[in-house]
């Protein structure tokens, strides 16, 4: 039932007609209105500018991974990045007909140390830079000892030095001397965290330049072991992203630390396989990103190293050239034994399904795992005129005279890289399962078109080594290379 309401008419007062305003009041009113509009515009611009500034500060501090959708890409990097391949060529190893020559690792390291102004972060496996560390009296240790001396001089001149190192079982003298000089050192117990080691090898200088490659902090890595790496100069975008990987190690080096189930957002990255960084590299457009292993050490946005490696293999259409010390489709350190065919399957598929030319240059020395030979023979057996599969395998043997042969754990090709017609992959891991699932490692991936870039330089290094007298087919007589190789 609708209630009965009493309505009363609302009386609106009748306004008296307004008279015309004088001209001076009209002009004053217009001026005030114009001023108010300008004030409003300035306020709007101030609010927008403040919002943009706060957003930029937020991204700088916390990363902007979650602000980008799946089809959106981060802004390109405008740094004039310069990449230089660097190598350690063991004493006595010569390439007389080579047309390519790269700076030495020791030259690159000393140059980075001389140019450091504010900070140096080093991720490392172990430290043996002096003869005392290896109980030797080798003149060739001088380069490593000079590197250590220059490192000791950094903190006293105001450079902040941080070193993340795998919890050591070996010599500590170098690290103790660096601590005394003012460096900070944290030991990462990867055995406790993932049942592996910290196998990474990189430097970041002033968050602007960096080295990444196969060389350990070992005098032998400068003069008695064949190494390859890359130095990036004036590339702060990539250097800051590599620093995020270092910060993860630094975090895990704290007492009682554990791997977070979800990494805090400051460790996240926006650069990965799906959204690589757009850079100008040696004057040429390129796409680049950094990958990391094992997966638990990959915060938001970081591509795992194995996924990155397999993407290079899967996207190759012409050739895949690989140079690594160890190649095993197994969990190398697993008990009981476990087969691990992830990379092996990718290479076979590339050769058989797409007709990609595959070349593997594997190291052979006195410490090679004998079971590698069977797996390498299996790969090489795919080369067949009927299937048109083209896989070839060679063993690289670094020769040694009597004195060199006495140097422990030396005279080996320690490279860890891959190059295709499109992409450069430079890593720090050997190619067996445990290195990608348990051990900490890092890789740099660069895609670049044209000739003369980093990719073509690395291809030239591979072909130089492949065609050299130090590379041997699997059916080579063991007598022809002496007893330095366990796989012949």
Curated annotation (Swiss-Prot):
GO molecular function: metal ion binding; single-stranded DNA 5'-3' DNA exonuclease activity
GO cellular component, as recorded: early endosome membrane; endoplasmic reticulum membrane; Golgi membrane; late endosome membrane; lysosomal lumen; lysosomal membrane
Occurrences of domain PLD phosphodiesterase (ranges): 194-221, 409-435
Membrane topology: Single-pass type II membrane protein
InterPro entries xref list: Diverse_PLD-related, PLDc_3, PLipase_D/transphosphatidylase
Keywords: Disulfide bond, Endoplasmic reticulum, Endosome, Exonuclease, Glycoprotein, Golgi apparatus, Hydrolase, Immunity, Inflammatory response, Lipid metabolism, Lysosome, Magnesium, Membrane, Metal-binding, Nuclease, Phospholipid metabolism, Repeat, Signal-anchor, Transmembrane, Transmembrane helix, Ubl conjugation
TM spans (from-to): 39-59
Protein name: 5'-3' exonuclease PLD3
């Amino acid at each position: 039932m609708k209630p009965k309401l009493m309505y009363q008419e609302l009386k609106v007062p009748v306004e008296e007609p307004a008279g015309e305003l004088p001209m001076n009041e009209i002009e004053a009113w217009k001026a005030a209105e114009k001023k108010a509009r300008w004030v409003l515009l300035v306020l709007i611009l101030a609010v927008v500018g403040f919002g943009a500034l706060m957003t930029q500060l937020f991204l700088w501090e916390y990363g902007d991974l979650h602000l980008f959708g799946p089809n959106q890409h981060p802004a390109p990097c405008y740094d004039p990045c310069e990449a230089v391949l660097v190598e350690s060529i063991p004493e006595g190893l010569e390439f007389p007909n080579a047309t390519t020559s790269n700076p030495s690792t020791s030259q690159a390291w000393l140059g980075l140390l001389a140019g450091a102004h504010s900070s140096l972060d080093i991720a490392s496996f172990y430290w043996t830079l002096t003869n005392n560390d290896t109980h030797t009296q080798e003149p060739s240790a001088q380069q490593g000892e000079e590197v250590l001396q220059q490192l000791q001089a950094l903190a006293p001149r105001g450079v902040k030095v941080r070193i993340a190192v795998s919890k050591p079982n070996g010599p500590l003298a170098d690290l103790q001397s660096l601590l005394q000089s003012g460096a900070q050192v944290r030991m990462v117990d990867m055995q406790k965290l993932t049942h592996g080691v910290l196998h990474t090898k990189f430097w970041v200088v002033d968050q602007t330049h960096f080295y990444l490659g196969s060389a350990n902090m070992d005098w032998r890595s400068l003069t008695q072991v064949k190494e390859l790496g890359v130095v990036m100069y004036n590339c702060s975008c990539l250097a800051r992203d590599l620093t995020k990987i270092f910060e993860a190690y630094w975090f895990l080096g704290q007492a009682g630390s554990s791997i977070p189930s979800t990494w805090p957002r400051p460790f996240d990255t926006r650069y990965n396989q799906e959204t690589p960084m757009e850079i100008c590299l040696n004057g040429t457009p390129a796409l680049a990103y950094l990958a990391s292993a094992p997966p638990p050490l990959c915060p938001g946005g970081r591509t795992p190293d194995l996924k990155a490696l397999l993407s290079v293999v899967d996207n190759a259409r012409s050739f895949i050239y690989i140079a690594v010390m160890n190649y095993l489709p197994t969990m190398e350190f697993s008990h009981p034994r476990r087969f691990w065919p992830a990379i092996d399957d990718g290479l076979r598929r590339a050769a058989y399904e797409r007709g990609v030319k595959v070349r593997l240059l594997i190291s052979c020395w006195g410490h090679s795992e004998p079971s590698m030979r069977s797996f390498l023979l299996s790969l090489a057996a795919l080369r067949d005129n009927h299937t048109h599969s083209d896989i070839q395998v060679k063993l690289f043997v670094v020769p040694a005279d009597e004195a060199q042969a006495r140097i422990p754990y030396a005279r080996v090709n320690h490279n860890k890289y891959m190059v295709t017609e499109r992409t450069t992959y430079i890593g720090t891991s050997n190619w067996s399962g445990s290195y990608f699932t348990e051990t900490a490692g890092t890789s740099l991936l660069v895609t670049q078109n044209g000739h003369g870039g980093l990719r073509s330089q690395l291809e030239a290094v591979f072909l130089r080594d492949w065609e050299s007298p130090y590379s041997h087919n699997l059916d080579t007589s063991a007598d022809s290379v002496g007893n330095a190789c366990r796989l012949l």
